[in-house]
């Protein structure tokens, strides 16, 4: 359960679980799985493909946690294959790493300076809070939503309920995310 994890690990985990569900929906689609080509699908020729967006979603979650713990650049991502199952395995390993790391991280540097070194050679210096608000969360959500959009663009039947499935736990009345009436408790 993500509620027992400290912030921001709880946010990353619940949205990574949504991404895992989204990929599972693609893999088990009633019209059949989209096939191996889907992991290389893009929204535009100059954009990353699905596998790169999933990898970057995982990377930004792990890097944010590492920076807050005072361990910048302590992240390695190993994608083991080019299938939806391999992408799901990467997501699940990332979730496990966030869960394993989070309880023991007593020292958080929300107010202290952290650095972000980009692959293009840029260096950004900001507080931990600024890093989350201005870098980590925007990057994380951009890549997650783009992965969702690639699947939608390739005919996978997804909707907002797949993306916000975690909101079911807050539903008080009306229909649950599966479309059925929610029983009052």
How should each PLM-predicted stretch be described?
Residues 16, 20-27, 62-65, 92-99, ...:
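Structural signal for well-ordered, non-membrane alpha-helices
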Residues 70-82, 153-159:
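Long amphipathic alpha-helical coiled-coil segments
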Residues 3-11, 35-59, 77-87, 123-139, ...:
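Alpha-helical scaffold segments that form or flank carboxylate-/histidine-based iron centers
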Residues 1-9, 21, 169-185:
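Basic/polar N-terminal segments that are highly enriched at the extreme N-terminus
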Residues 30:
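Globin-like tetrapyrrole-binding proteins
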Residues 46-74, 94-102:
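Conserved alpha-helical segments that form or flank metal/cofactor-binding pockets of metalloenzymes
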Residues 129-174, 179:
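C-terminal or internal capping secondary-structure element at the end of a domain, subdomain, or sheet
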Residues 80-119, 123-151:
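Acidic/histidine-rich alpha-helical segments that form the ligand environment
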């Amino acid at each position: 359960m993500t509620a027992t994890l400290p912030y921001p690990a709880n946010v990353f985990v619940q949205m990574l679980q949504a991404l895992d569900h989204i990929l599972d929906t693609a893999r088990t689609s009633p019209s059949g799985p989209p096939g191996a080509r889907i992991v290389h699908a893009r929204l535009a020729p100059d954009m990353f493909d699905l596998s790169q967006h999933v990898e970057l979603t995982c990377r930004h979650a792990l890097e944010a946690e590492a920076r807050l713990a005072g361990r910048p650049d302590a992240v390695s991502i190993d994608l083991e294959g080019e299938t939806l199952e391999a992408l799901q395995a990467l997501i699940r390993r990332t979730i496990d790493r966030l869960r394993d790391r989070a309880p023991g991280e007593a020292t958080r540097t929300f107010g202290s300076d952290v650095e972000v070194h980009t692959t293009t050679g840029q260096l950004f210096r900001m507080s931990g809070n600024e890093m989350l608000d201005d870098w980590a969360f925007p990057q994380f959500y951009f890549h997650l939503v783009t992965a969702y959009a690639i699947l939608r663009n390739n005919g996978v039947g997804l909707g907002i309920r797949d993306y916000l499935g975690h909101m079911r736990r807050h539903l008080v009345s009306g229909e649950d995310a599966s479309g059925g009436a929610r029983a009052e408790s």
